[in-house]
Amino acid sequence: MILTSNVKLMPGSKVEAVIQISKEFVKAKYNEILKDYSSRLKVKGFRTGRVPFSIIEGKYSDNIRALAIENLIHKSLEEFFESAIYKPLSYAVPKILDEKLEINFDKDFEFTFVYESYPEFEISDISNFKVEIPEVVISDSDIEDELKLLQFENSIIVEDNGSVKVGSIVRVDFVELDDSLNEILATKRQDFVLTVGESDDYYGFGYDIIGMKKDEEKIVEKNYGSDYKFSELANTSKRLKIGVKDIKRRDIPELDDAFAKDVKDSLNTLEDLRDYVRENMLKVVQEKTNSLKLSKLLSGIAEKVNIDVPSSMFEAELKNVINEFSHQNKINITQLQNSSTGLEGVNDVFKENVLNKLKSKLVFQKMVDNDSSEVTELDLENELIKQAQNLKMAPQDVKKFYKERNLFGLLKDEIKRQKVKEKILQDLEEIKLEKVSFRDFVNYKTGE
């Protein structure tokens, strides 16, 4: 139906397109809608389906023309995007630039629109790219720390009839109070669980409830300094009403041969467990090293390439990051968006970090797109077998899961991404830096 289409790239990875549709097609579409009206309209003096077109046009011409224009735009956009060189972002809606569109049967129909597309950029040769990686040292104390974590993971939670202390697992209700000691309902939280001295709660009241007993309630005055971890609370004072509903504690198992056997049946002694822990730590170091190498490579490339990120793509990424932050810190997203940490209140440094990570993702996706290798049936079969082993399921059941949900396309995409990642890491040159401890290395943010 499209007679011609002309496109041009604009700043912000926007594309301006002009679509022209033949006057013959426009007339045919108009007549199609006119006939549909005729088949359904009831006009006094005429049988349904027998109303003359002239009468219908005289009364409903504007409606018919508006429907025709709407239909022409919708269908032509579908056809345009099926073969578009610059693919549109799925979450960005095309914007029609023409203030007023009209049908003239003596002329071809034309309209102009703008949409945001996937950023266009090229990646230069990376064969000489080098990344700096610290040398990781696994000490005896690192192994002991991992054993303590295992003890913690294998502990059980039991009721505690005493008072709240450091390490207590406490379930509380809390709410902010105004100057008249009235509850500010938007801040009310119920059944909030924290571990005193360990949990990073929003208001930072963990140590303020030490000594409280079950069913006890108290009002806490909190003053936040200029360097408080949540900037929206910095230099403010809050009055909180906190009620303790439940107190529990962890029962930690002894570190002995029996514990080693409980962790893994094939382990017989505590020394066997230490060796097992060291092997797992080495695997973690390798995985983290690969993540760090890839992250440094992608960010290094992104710094050298001009990537014009569309505003809607950045906003979508920013919202995802804020939602993830809300989930991790157990903050109500509505409360978060209403505060200064909402999209408008996010500081420039935070936005810049989000933008840089987004550019790294785009660079990696470009490398995947540029890679000519294909995912074979053998690759797919091996991945299904691996997943079946990890999930302790039969391979045919895993295959059935993907087939029923039509997810094989996504699985193939993920397999290719993994293959490209392995190829990049295999060829990437590594420069060793200073020695660091296992814990410091694991806690290092890769930015991936």
UniProtKB/Swiss-Prot annotation:
Q: Which reaction does it catalyse?
A: [protein]-peptidylproline (omega=180) = [protein]-peptidylproline (omega=0)
UniProt xrefs under Pfam families: Trigger_C, Trigger_N
Can you supply one Gene Ontology CC term for this chain's record? cytoplasm
Q: Which domain of life is it from?
A: Bacteria
Q: Provide the E.C. number(s) assigned to this enzyme.
A: 5.2.1.8
| Keywords, in A-Z order | Cell cycle, Cell division, Chaperone, Cytoplasm, Isomerase, Rotamase
Any one Gene Ontology BP term: protein transport
Covalent S-S links between cysteines? none
Gene3D superfamilies, alphabetically? 3.10.50.40, Trigger factor ribosome-binding domain (3.30.70.1050), Trigger factor, C-terminal domain (1.10.3120.10)
GO MF terms here are:
peptidyl-prolyl cis-trans isomerase activity
What's this protein's function?
Involved in protein export. Acts as a chaperone by maintaining the newly synthesized protein in an open conformation. Functions as a peptidyl-prolyl cis-trans isomerase.
- What is the name of this protein? Trigger factor
Query: What is the organism lineage in this UniProt record?
Result: Bacteria, Pseudomonadati, Spirochaetota, Spirochaetia, Spirochaetales
